[in-house]
A protein has these predicted regions:
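Positively charged n-region of N-terminal signal peptides that target proteins for export
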Residues: 1-4
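Sequence-structural signature of mature extracellular/luminal beta-sheet repeat domains
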Residues: 22-358
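Bacterial N-terminal signal peptides
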Residues: 7-17
């Protein structure tokens, strides 16, 4: 009997191993055959810059990375990304060079004693003073979610900064976290309390809620207050701009975008709350077929337009904060992994800022 039980256990173990081999291919966990059209079975995630880079020439020590965006200029392109504790935006070029693109990406004042939330970075405690989200407007100008500065700003062609939003009804925002720009120039962004020391209990908090906002032609509108009970974080528009997705608190919400840019019919699109692996919605993007990509438990989730979880791009170093479609063909995803940059090639081009489909 014991031998029979042992044989049965061995068969079950082998069967489980076969199941894992079938569902996990390299850096991809495949939950649906439809994923093969999106990312090839032999696709590999490679660390291209940071303290875990394989090439010594690509070693670079970052603080805490976020909010990448790819900028394509003719045949050449480069990646911009935030280092929040350093309060800078870095520029990475395909030859592996890193340079400072913008100083004081978030907090731009002189007394930072109460600016930016505190966070643990390994054994270090850091202050999130910088921007946490980047995108481009239809004119190709850089737009920043200035978390530590509690403002949304735009970098003009001459290098000056324009404040697009820093107050709602005279009260300071808590800390813009991420943003997306519609083809008509409307900027949608999420706001939370991460721009202040002490966050929700900060004596410098002026708005008693987290929100989703839209700013267009100099007018700021509050679209959703504490949307369906989540703390809003990631945000992205569908390729046809009919839907707006908002992620946070282990849920992804979907809203209908009205003709005036406001939102309606908010509902839970994906619920990750039952997952036992760490991670949740933060960075979010879409590809040209309408698939949604979101950070989540275990890495980056790839979700069909119908809300089905097709698979996960597994990421090292304790998770991924955000990502962006890059390269000239928009078929590479560049990830910010706290202290490293990584890349993987895809089969379907992503939707990039300032190049949205009609």
């Amino acid at each position: 009997m014991k031998r029979l039980a042992l044989c049965a256990l061995l068969v079950l173990s082998l069967g489980f191993g076969l199941l894992i081999a079938q569902t996990a291919s390299g850096d991809i966990v495949r939950l649906d055959p439809a994923l093969d059209a999106i990312v090839s079975p032999n696709a590999k995630l490679e660390i291209i810059q940071g303290d875990q880079a394989q090439q010594p020439s690509n070693f670079f020590y970052f603080g805490a990375l976020e909010g990448p965006v790819w900028v394509q200029e003719g045949q050449n392109g480069y990646l911009l990304f935030c280092d929040i504790p350093a309060n800078v935006v870095y520029k990475w070029t395909p030859d592996g060079k890193v340079s400072v693109f913008l100083e004081k990406s978030g907090f731009r004042g002189t007394d930072a004693s109460n600016a930016g939330m505190q966070a643990n970075n390994g054994r270090l405690e850091v202050i999130y003073l910088g921007a946490s989200g980047l995108t481009l407007d239809p004119q190709g100008r850089l737009v920043l979610a200035g978390l530590g500065g509690r403002e949304v700003t735009r970098v003009e062609k001459d290098g000056s900064r324009t404040v697009l939003a820093d107050r709602y009804e005279g009260k300071r925002l808590g800390g813009p976290n991420d943003l997306v720009v519609k083809s008509d120039g409307a900027v949608y962004f999420t706001d939370m309390t991460a721009g202040m020391r002490g966050r929700d209990t900060s004596p410098f908090r002026e708005l008693p809620f987290n929100g989703v906002y839209m700013v267009k032609d100099g007018n700021l509108r509050l679209l959703e207050k504490d949307p369906l009970g989540i703390v809003p974080n990631g945000i992205v528009l569908a390729p046809d701009e009919k839907y707006l997705y908002v992620g946070g608190s282990r849920k992804i919400l979907r809203y209908d975008v009205q003709s005036d840019g406001t939102l309606a019919n908010g509902r839970v699109f994906v619920d990750m709350s039952t997952e036992t692996v760490p991670g949740g919605p933060d960075g979010m993007k879409v590809d040209q077929k309408g698939n949604i990509y979101s950070t989540g438990p275990g890495g980056v989730w790839i979700i069909s337009p119908e809300g089905k979880h097709l698979g996960t791009i597994r990421t090292p170093e304790g998770g991924v904060t955000n990502f962006a479609f890059g390269d000239a063909d928009a078929k590479a995803i560049y990830f910010t992994l706290r202290r490293n940059l990584a890349r993987i090639r895809m089969n379907i081009p992503g939707v990039r800022p300032a190049t949205r489909q009609s």
